Amino acid sequence: MNKKFYITTLGCPKNTADSMSMHHSLLEEGFTPATFAEESDFHFINTCTFIQSATEETIQTILSAAQVKKQNHQKLVVVGCFAERYPDNISSEIPEVDLFFGTGRYAQAGKILREKFPDLSPPKREFNDSLLEKLKLSSEIENYSKPYAYVKVSDGCNRGCSFCIIPSFRGKFRESPVEDILRDVDRAIRAGAKEICLVSQDTVYYGRNSEVLLDMVRKVAEIDSLEVLRLLYLYPDKKTEKLLRLMGETPKIAPYLESPLQHVSSKILKSMNRVGESSTFKDLFALAREVKPGLEIRTSFIIGYPGEEPGDVDQVLRFIEETRPEKVNLFSYSPQEGTKGAELKQTVSEKEKSRRINLIRDVHLAILEEIHESRIGQTYDAIVDSVENDQAVVRRFQDAPEMDEVVYVDDISLIPGMIGKIRIDSFYEYDMNGTWISK
């Protein structure tokens, strides 16, 4: 009895890593991955509820899957952040959901499914460690064909930011043993990944002290078959400075800093329960560019937080104009029930939030156009992500997969995973066109 599963993943790269853990658990219990959701017996939706728009996308995805379920006689399984946060709502308002569980049980997904649906589960198969590893590896090769992979180094968060609901359902910070991280990296590389992205809610908190964090990163970078190592979500504190210096000493680490600042006004940062100030953030960005030539920066800001005034927005504008981060993500603040921020008087209207975001975006787009102009004729180390519609989709090492710019190349002879040099020829608002000049 061949029972197939399919996993739809919403949200951030951390969810992608969790879906892989769930994928492996289902393989261990004898379930088979489906190529399409419509042909699966069990459709899993790994959800996101970080902000209101993510929650709305999750609900719409579940409702759409519920319609498909009726036609295909599937079981619909909702997992992750939304299931952890709103279990009562799922039970009472979405009866089409056959099973749901939260963020701490991804690695038990196969056993949970077998216990809940014993009559619909495949026969239990016994694997020795070697055979199981081969099965997981071959499944990754078949189902995760991109030349990059996400490896999670921890879960949960101890920061206590007043706008963030994640600790309430992800829990306190828990790090993965170095041995587990190295195993996951090795498996991803053997499955074809050329680039490894280390992800977590708070990567720099790993090990609680700088040396443990640096030692973990060094061990990953020392893996001979690894081509590119990318570090994601670096909280802007003193440990990040030490990590940046290691990046400068380690050629394999991508010239890329992702550090979500969320704001630069000291007043708003204090209300958000975050550390740092505009001057320390400027120093951090300057250090990153000093120790890693060619490095590009991705950051984010939450606009419209309670108490934010025009002067606070001006500080964000001045910061962007002075530091010129290449990639800026802007979020409209949405109060999350159960957070300290939601208890504050909401002083900024939705219309005003949109106006402020548009103002900041226009300023950054003007800067980005100048940055794009400076890229014309320049060459960059790059990796081929895919070939589709008679074009290759290429990504500079300065750009992270799935969230940053790509370069389109009219060369279908390129192969996903190929690493070489690309010349930038022209640009759009965000993405670029280029020529592959080295194979």
UniProtKB/Swiss-Prot annotation:
UniProt cross-references to Pfam families, sorted A to Z: Radical_SAM (PF04055), TRAM_2 (PF18693), UPF0004 (PF00919)
Keywords: 4Fe-4S, Cytoplasm, Iron, Iron-sulfur, Metal-binding, S-adenosyl-L-methionine, Transferase
SUPFAM superfamilies: Radical SAM enzymes
Domain Radical SAM core: 143-370
Domain TRAM: 373-438
Amino-acid positions noted as binding [4Fe-4S] cluster 1 in the UniProt annotation, renumbered to this chain: C12, C48, C81
Free-text comment on the cofactor: Binds 2 [4Fe-4S] clusters. One cluster is coordinated with 3 cysteines and an exchangeable S-adenosyl-L-methionine.
GO MF, one example: 4 iron, 4 sulfur cluster binding
Domain (MTTase N-terminal): residue spans on this chain: 3-118
Binding of [4Fe-4S] cluster 2, residues: C157, C161, C164
Described purpose of this protein according to its UniProt entry: Catalyzes the methylthiolation of an aspartic acid residue of ribosomal protein uS12.
Family recorded in the similarity comment: Belongs to the methylthiotransferase family. RimO subfamily.
Protein name: Ribosomal protein uS12 methylthiotransferase RimO
Protein source organism: Leptospira borgpetersenii serovar Hardjo-bovis (strain JB197)
